[in-house]
């Protein structure tokens, strides 16, 4: 599930990490009747070639259970077909050249089971409430005479079957094996790659199985450090896991989730209130624009984007670095991953001090840089925590708790008041609308149609979908068919209205503000004594001594959790049985004395799949288990019946929405559960025993692949052994034959290369000439090598693209922003200092404007300054005095033109288009005057008498004061001087002309121009 809102925070703070995916579309020929698939063996259109593609399959299974771009499936076959199309699209986007790794969630560590249990119990509770509300709405519709289509039975009515050990997950594993065989045998883009399938019978979460593969391969001989990885998944913690690998060339592929200003809208029609899966183009039908078949078949695809980890590393290098401190990027990244654990993770409850929507990450980073890292110490060393430094860091964070709680109370108070005002306004508007409708009903007229033609026209022109297409000339059979279609359309409309009302009802019910069912805040974190009230309400502490004892144990377990998560992210599970035994977390200021804690873990072993189902599923999902297990969940006399309460408390814990509440379920006692399961395990069938077993990853390659010969030779040596014995005999993989992949292979049970691979998906054809061979794949040993990226040999580090200018600063921290809204992020700009006394920016612009106006006002009298305001709206010169005549210099002369004031704009005052427009307004007298003036200037420009402006006269007088007295020249001397100046000017002009002609002749002969 990951960290809520973390991805939104990431793309807002580090926007350049996001790259839009460029997709090719299949080519349609013969008018769209035939579609030519995309050749994935061709270069990637995104300009970046990937070696390995990793699929977190649960991020594919869930969207295919509840798709947004099509109606929900009703059978497993429809789900599988949707998944195959989904994987095809992802494969074409990325086009891996070496490996495709599909990882399905297996049995999770006990620390994750608590969250899975709460989520599945909550889903069952919400489904029961939704079913009850839907039944009431159906009865209401029936009383109103609105017909609804009957309910459709579905195999996928319960999404809780997406859990290891269920029949669905076993069927899915075989369906994916069939899909892999089909693609490797037929698709040219798959021909040279290896495919690894880690299904639900392999213990571990899907994303962590992927990280184990990368981690175990990277430090072995033969591994290429420049391998380009791409990981698909929806969980936000995939970003943390990718950073933890310290692999440079890493991207995450995911759907575009957030559209600015369009959250919660259907992306097909852009309307709110429904998903794209439920969209039937109602908006078009309401306006009478009925969709034809071709329009209805068009599917709008959701866009995708890459999150480039190497860009994120550059951002963090700038954002986490302390000026003057020694730079170690990998350790800074490790510390960043660790501090993000405090704002949310899948294994520990949320700390009440820190909310990511309240700028918690900015606060943590600010404390890290300004108050902690100034000591030049780190919080982590790979997977190990320096608890002394962690305590110092979190103590500095805890100093802001009072300010955070005060600000949070102010924000909640404002939201509550605003909602009450909005609710009162909406109620008044609804009352006014009802009164208006009532008045129209009493004052309306009865419209009588004179003919059947008018009846037909009114029916066909109705904007609603609920109309009857009857033609008076059609026969009775066609009329009956169209009547039946219209009735069916009416039922679909009613069903759509039912879904809309149900969704709105459930949304309002789950909103504490709208429903008015918000719980009273008994802790009151903004008032004195909040710590004592917190432990009294949440942990049932009855005395000061008991509160202190509980606090110490909570701090111990929470610190154990931090250490467990850090090890899990960097080196895998350190204990399968450890879990946090409380529903609530401590405050940041409670984490004291961490250095004295003795923290140790025992590895243990994972649950069996059926035991995990008993631990996480509610009794409403007992159908997902074998028959012999169901009574343990549904029978009141079961020894573990107390694990499955019919109802349970949901603590809103100060939150607004019900989904944010904490499900206070009893924790499962492992010993009691395993003892109860052992009593019924003997009744399992062979197929159920297989579903309840821990299996291995499977490797698939084309028989012509270099690994194909290795698999065949291994199979020939183990043909006479049992399946259990064959799995124990392993062969080391030569990385030279496998594009740098290390590990071991073992023979799989049965035929590793059947000549015909039978279809396991209904309606799909068998693979008749199979060329794919498979084997068991086992990871190599986890060699913990150097995590310092720049020390890895042969590593090609991408060119730097991020600078300080690209960083965004949040300004004030959330709790420091007083009672105002938080200021938007601002771009950090490098400060440039101007010389003393100079002006720039806005001051320079205003000064320039004043200078232009002064110059215009100081023009000679013949310019005839207009005292009327200019008629040029939307310009900076609005209501300023402008000249009626503006000089334009052409051919060493002056042409006076008179533009209309409405055409004067501040841009391109002398452009040819503007001059042409002005010439249209000239009079014959003004044109003749301009010609005379121009001809007189051509005869002797020196005879032109210029009128000096006051500013020019003032400047000239000032200059005269500073000039030393000189002997006054006679008239003859002035004429001689003038002649000499004219001759010098003529000579200079002649030299320039000759120089230009020489260059022109030189370039014409092909001589290259001189370079600077």
Swiss-Prot record:
UniProt feature, compositional bias: Basic residues: 990-1002
Keyword terms: Exonuclease, Hydrolase, Metal-binding, mRNA processing, Nuclease, Nucleus, rRNA processing, Zinc, Zinc-finger
Keyword Hydrolase: yes
Pfam families for this protein: XRN_M, XRN_N, zf-CCHC
Biased composition (Basic and acidic residues): 415-433, 918-928, 950-962
Family annotation (PROSITE patterns): ZF_CCHC (PS50158)
PANTHER family registered for this protein in UniProt: 5'-3' EXORIBONUCLEASE 2, 5'->3' EXORIBONUCLEASE
The name this protein goes by in its record: 5'-3' exoribonuclease 2
E.C. number: 3.1.13.-
GO molecular function: 5'-3' RNA exonuclease activity; RNA binding; zinc ion binding
Zn-finger region bounds: CCHC-type: 264-281
Ranges of biased composition (kind: Polar residues): 904-914
The family this protein is said to belong to: Belongs to the 5'-3' exonuclease family. XRN2/RAT1 subfamily.
Organism: Arabidopsis thaliana
Coiled-coil regions listed: none
Keyword Zinc: yes
GO CC entries: nucleus
Biological role: Possesses 5'->3' exoribonuclease activity. Acts as an endogenous post-transcriptional gene silencing (PTGS) suppressor. Degrades miRNA-derived loops, excised during miRNA maturation in the nucleus. Involved in pre-rRNA processing. Involved in the primary exonucleolytic shortening of the 5' external transcribed spacer (5'ETS), required for endonucleolytic processing at site P by the U3 snoRNP complex. Involved with XRN3 in the 5'-end processing of 5.8S and 25S rRNAs. Contributes with XRN3 to polyadenylation-dependent nuclear RNA surveillance.
Region (Disordered): 411-439, 888-976, 990-1012
GO terms of biological process kind: miRNA catabolic process; mRNA processing; negative regulation of post-transcriptional gene silencing; nuclear polyadenylation-dependent rRNA catabolic process; nuclear-transcribed mRNA catabolic process; rRNA 5'-end processing
The organism's place on the tree of life at top rank: Eukaryota
Cellular location(s): Nucleus
Tissue-wise expression: Expressed in roots, leaves, stems and flowers.
């Amino acid at each position: 599930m990951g960290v809520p809102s973390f991805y939104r925070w990431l793309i807002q703070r580090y926007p350049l990490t996001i790259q839009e995916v460029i997709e090719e579309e299949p080519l349609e020929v013969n008018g769209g009747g035939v579609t030519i698939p995309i050749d994935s063996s061709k270069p990637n259109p995104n300009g970046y070639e990937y070696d390995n593609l990793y699929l977190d399959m649960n991020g594919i299974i869930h969207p295919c259970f509840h798709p947004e771009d099509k109606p929900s499936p009703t059978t497993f076959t429809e789900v599988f077909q949707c998944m195959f199309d989904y994987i095809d699209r992802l494969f074409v986007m990325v086009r891996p050249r070496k490996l495709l790794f599909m990882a399905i969630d297996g049995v999770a560590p006990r620390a994750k089971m608590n969250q899975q249990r709460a989520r599945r119990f909550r889903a069952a509770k919400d489904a029961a409430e939704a079913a009850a509300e839907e039944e009431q709405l159906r009865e209401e519709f029936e009383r109103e005479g609105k017909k609804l289509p009957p309910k459709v039975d579905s195999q996928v009515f319960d999404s809780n079957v997406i859990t290891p050990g269920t029949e669905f997950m076993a069927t899915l594993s075989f369906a994916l094996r069939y899909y892999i065989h089909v693609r490797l045998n037929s698709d040219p883009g798959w021909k040279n790659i290896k495919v690894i399938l880690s299904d639900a019978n392999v213990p571990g979460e899907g994303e962590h199985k992927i990280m184990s593969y990368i981690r175990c391969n990277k430090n072995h001989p033969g591994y290429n450090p420049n391998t380009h990885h791409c990981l698909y998944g929806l969980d936000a913690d995939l970003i943390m896991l990718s950073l933890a690998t310290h692999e440079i060339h890493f991207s995450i592929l995911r759907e575009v989730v957030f559209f600015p200003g369009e959250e919660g809208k259907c992306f097909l029609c852009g309307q709110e209130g429904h998903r794209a899966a439920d969209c039937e183009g109602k908006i078009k039908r309401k306006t009478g624009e009925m969709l034809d078949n071709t329009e209805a078949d068009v599917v709008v695809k959701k866009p995708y984007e890459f999150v480039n980890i190497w860009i994120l590393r550059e951002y963090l290098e700038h954002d986490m670095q302390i000026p003057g401190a020694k730079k170690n990027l990998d350790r800074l990244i490790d510390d960043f991953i660790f501090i993000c654990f405090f704002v949310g993770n899948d294994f520990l409850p949320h700390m009440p001090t820190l909310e990511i929507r309240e700028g918690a990450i900015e606060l943590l980073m600010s404390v890290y840089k300004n108050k902690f890292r100034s000591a030049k110490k780190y919080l982590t060393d790979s997977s190990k925590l320096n608890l002394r430094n962690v305590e110092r860091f979190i103590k500095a964070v805890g100093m802001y708790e009072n300010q955070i709680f005060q600000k949070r109370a102010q924000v909640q108070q404002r939201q509550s008041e605003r909602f009450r005002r909005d609710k009162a306004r909406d109620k008044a508007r609804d009352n006014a609308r009802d009164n208006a409708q009532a008045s129209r009903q009493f004052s309306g007229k009865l419209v009588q149609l004179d003919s059947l033609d008018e009846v037909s026209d009114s029916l066909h022109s109705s904007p609603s979908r609920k109309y009857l297409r009857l033609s008076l000339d059609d026969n009775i059979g066609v009329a009956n068919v169209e009547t039946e279609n219209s009735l069916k359309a009416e039922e679909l409309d009613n069903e759509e209205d039912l879904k809309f009302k149900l969704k709105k009802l459930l949304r309002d019910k789950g909103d504490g503000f709208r429903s008015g069912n918000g719980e009273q805040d008994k802790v009151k974190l903004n008032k004195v004594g909040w710590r004592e009230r917190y432990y009294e309400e949440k942990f049932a502490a009855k005395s000061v001594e008991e509160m202190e004892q509980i606090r110490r144990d909570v701090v111990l377990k929470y610190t154990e959790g931090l250490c467990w998560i850090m090890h899990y992210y960097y080196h895998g599970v350190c204990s399968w049985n450890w879990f946090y035994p409380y529903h609530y977390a401590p405050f940041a200021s409670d984490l004291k004395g961490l250095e004295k804690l003795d923290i140790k873990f025992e590895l243990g072993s994972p649950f069996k799949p059926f035991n995990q189902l008993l631990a996480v599923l509610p009794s409403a999902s007992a159908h997902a288990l074998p028959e012999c297990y169901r009574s343990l969940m549904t029978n009141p006399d079961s020894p573990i019946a107390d694990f499955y309460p019919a109802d349970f408390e949901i603590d809103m814990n100060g939150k607004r929405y019900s989904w944010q509440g904490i499900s206070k379920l009893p924790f499962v006692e492992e010993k009691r559960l395993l003892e109860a399961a052992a009593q019924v395990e003997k009744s399992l069938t062979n197929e159920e025993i297989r579903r309840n077993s821990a299996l291995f990853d499977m490797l698939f390659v084309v028989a012509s692949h270099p690994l194909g010969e290795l698999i065949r030779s291994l199979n020939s040596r183990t043909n006479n052994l049992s399946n259990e014995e064959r799995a124990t005999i392993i062969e080391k993989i030569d990385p030279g034959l496998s594009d740098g992949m290390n590990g071991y292979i073992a023979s799989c049970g049965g035929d590793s290369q059947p000549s015909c691979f039978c279809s396991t998906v209904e309606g799909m054809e068998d693979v008749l000439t199979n060329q794919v061979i498979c084997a068991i794949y086992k990871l190599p040993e986890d060699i913990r090598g150097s995590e310092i990226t720049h020390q890895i040999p042969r590593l090609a580090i991408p060119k730097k693209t991020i600078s300080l200018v690209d960083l965004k600063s949040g300004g004030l921290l959330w709790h420091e922003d007083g009672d105002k809204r938080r200021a938007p992020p601002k771009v950090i700009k490098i400060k440039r200092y101007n010389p003393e006394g100079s002006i720039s920016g806005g001051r320079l612009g205003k000064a320039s404007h004043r200078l232009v106006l002064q110059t215009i006002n100081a023009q000679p009298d013949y310019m005839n300054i207009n005292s009327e305001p200019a008629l040029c709206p939307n310009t900076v010169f609005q209501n300023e005095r402008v000249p009626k005549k503006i000089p334009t210099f052409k051919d060493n002369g002056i042409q006076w033109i008179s533009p209309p004031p409405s055409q004067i704009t501040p841009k391109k005052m002398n452009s040819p288009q503007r001059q042409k427009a002005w010439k249209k307004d000239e009079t014959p007298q003004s044109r003749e005057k301009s010609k005379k003036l121009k001809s007189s200037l051509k005869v002797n420009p020196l005879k032109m008498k210029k009128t000096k402006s006051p500013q020019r006269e003032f400047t000239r007088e000032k200059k005269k004061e500073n000039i030393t007295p000189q002997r006054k020249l006679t008239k003859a001397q002035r004429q001689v001087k003038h002649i000499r100046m004219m001759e010098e000017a003529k000579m200079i002009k002649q030299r320039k002309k000759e120089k230009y002609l020489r260059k022109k002749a030189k370039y014409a002969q092909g001589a290259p121009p001189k370079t600077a």
